[in-house]
Amino acid sequence: MAASDTERDGLAPEKTSPDTDKKKEQSDVSVSPRASKHHYSRSRSRSRERKRKSDNEGRKHRSRSRSKEARRHESKDKSSKKHKSEEHNDKEHSSDKGRERLNSSENGEDRHKRKERKSSRGRSHSRSRSRERRHRSRSRERKKSRSRSRDRKKSRSRSRERKKSRSRSRERKRRIRSRSRSRSRHRHRSRSRSRTRSRSRDRKKRIEKPRRFSRSLSRTPSPPPFRGRNTAMDAQEALARRLERAKKLQEQREKEMVEKQKQQEIAAAAAATGGSVLNVAALLASGTQVTPQIAMAAQMAALQAKALAETGIAVPSYYNPAAVNPMKFAEQEKKRKMLWQGKKEGDKSQSAEIWEKLNFGNKDQNVKFRKLMGIKSEDEAGCSSVDEESYKTLKQQEEVFRNLDAQYEMARSQTHTQRGMGLGFTSSMRGMDTV
């Protein structure tokens, strides 16, 4: 009986060991990818446990002390395995290797074959599963990204269609409103209330919509119809206004000029009739306002009348009467007349007659002298009919001029080494002969 108890006790912990080993394998797989490297050691631990079962069945004849020691050893191994699996996986593998060395002497060849088969199976299964999982996750991500891009495209196209439909509906509403307003203006009062209510409702709806649409609606006003025609009409109206203003200004200027001319005529008439004081009095009596300009014009007109009475010369109308002194202007006009009037026949003086009758004894010399003095050649005919006294004087003059010329030529020949003789009226040889 005692032996049977010991066998049961020995078998119980051994039966529980495969469950714990399965849990350990699951924890090792889920902990880290590094654990996948140690599939070989796990397969060894499984074969070890099976061999233990077979050994314990064959060792039923062993003593109770041996079973107690085994129990203690296994309980210690369990506690150490739990701690090691949670904290350090490397220590567990080292303890498994030690157990493998103890049991390696029993069935070496079978154990190696089983290990190789299981390790290859475990590795292949784990690697294929991880690859399948990765492939599935990647395909799912691709499908999700494709579906997202499709959703985005659909949402964009929908938003565009909505915008287009809204703009079309707005244009239709505007056309309908413009037509209704043009047709039914006399019914405006009855329909204005309903329109205002509907507009307020539309505004509320627009406010409830996203903000960007309301902004775009408020910022873009409805285009006015026939904008080009309005601009052309505006330009024509502006031109017409400018022409009207120019006409008005021209009329005002013409009126001012007419008034000034009238004032000047009045001032001239007043100056002709009497003094400036009387003229101003006459203007005051007539009812016209006397300005400083009118007073100055009256004074200048009085001065002009005075100069005209003294000299008989009037200042022309194209001169400014305020800028021209009438007395000085009269003196200048007298001088001009004296200069430009024609000479009379009986106004020759005695000196003029003497210079005209002057004779140098040479015709060429006489002609040159008369040209220089401005004496006309018509008087040559009158020179023949001269008195005896005048004839004597003319002869004396000729002799004097001849003697002077001869002396001058002699002096010139001596001092200037015959560079030139005389004034050019006579030859050098003739002067030398006379000497």
From Swiss-Prot:
Keywords: Acetylation, Coiled coil, Isopeptide bond, Phosphoprotein, Ubl conjugation. The keyword Acetylation applies. There is a cross-link at K376 (Glycyl lysine isopeptide (Lys-Gly) (interchain with G-Cter in SUMO1)). Residues 1-230 are annotated as: Disordered. Pfam families: SMAP (PF15477). The modification Phosphoserine is found at S4, S17, S30, S32, S104, S377. The modification Phosphothreonine is found at T6, T16. The modification N-acetylalanine is found at A2. Residues 35-51, 112-214 have a biased composition (Basic residues). Residues 230-272 form a coiled coil. The keyword Hydrolase does not apply. Residues 1-27, 66-111 have a biased composition (Basic and acidic residues). There is a cross-link at K376 (Glycyl lysine isopeptide (Lys-Gly) (interchain with G-Cter in SUMO2)). Belongs to the RSRC2 family. This is Arginine/serine-rich coiled-coil protein 2. It comes from Bos taurus (Bovine). The gene is RSRC2.
